[in-house]
């Protein structure tokens, strides 16, 4: 969990080459990602040539900071294979999911090995195909920049757990989720206080109502009014 929560998107890199063993381990992490029916339709292109990295940065909508990363990994999918097993859904959806799962594994592995990485999804697809020699039956999905980080970005703001967590059906919020996982939440504490107050108020009302009914009943028996 620490690796997940401390990972950051790195866009500044030191001018230090990466040990190829670490690059290989990062790619191995991508290959460990799940795929539908274990079809393993992902493909990985490791780019370290300076000129080609400059071309990739240009194709990624002129994100020139990418050139400083000594390694780019282009994650592609073999859409012919995806379609062969799962038809149009495999070609249009599963293939994208597989590349995304591989990319996330690789980002975490990079962080584990002390490397910085960033997920790039904005690029000219045809330009990327040309630069990396991607055949027509394959499609580039994600580019990951990789290198030793030259920055430590702060943790970006995130919504609290119960904001987007539902139980059983969409929109049914899990208001006690943080209590279940022992994670304090001001929102949950507020709900607990409100619930206790409502119970106390309800109890007091019931007691008062019971006393009134008792007085009324006693009055009927004795003919006295309280």
Each model region followed by its residue ranges:
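Acidic, surface-exposed loops and disordered segments
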Residues: 1-226
């Amino acid at each position: 969990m620490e690796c997940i929560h401390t990972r950051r998107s790195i866009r500044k890199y030191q001018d230090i080459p990466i040990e190829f063993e670490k690059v290989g381990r990062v790619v191995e992490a991508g290959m460990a990602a799940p795929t539908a029916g274990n079809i393993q339709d992902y493909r990985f292109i490791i780019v370290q040539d300076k000129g080609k990295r400059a071309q990739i940065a240009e194709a990624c909508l002129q994100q020139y900071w990418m050139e400083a990363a000594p390694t780019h990994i282009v994650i592609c999918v073999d859409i012919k294979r995806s379609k062969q097993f799962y038809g149009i859904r495999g070609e249009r959806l599963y293939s994208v999911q597989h590349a995304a799962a591989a990319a996330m594994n690789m980002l975490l592995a990079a962080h584990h090995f002390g490397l910085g990485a960033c997920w790039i999804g904005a690029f000219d697809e045809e330009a990327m195909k040309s630069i990396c020699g991607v055949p027509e039956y394959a499609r580039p999905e994600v580019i990951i920049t990789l290198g030793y980080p030259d920055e430590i970005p702060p943790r970006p703001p995130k919504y609290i757990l119960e904001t987007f967590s539902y139980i059983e059906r969409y929109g049914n919020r899990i208001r006690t989720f943080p209590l279940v996982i022992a994670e304090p939440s001001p929102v949950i504490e507020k709900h607990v206080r409100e619930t206790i107050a409502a119970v106390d108020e309800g109890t007091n009302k019931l007691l008062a109502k019971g006393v009134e009914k008792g007085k009324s009943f006693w009055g009927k028996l004795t003919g006295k009014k309280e």
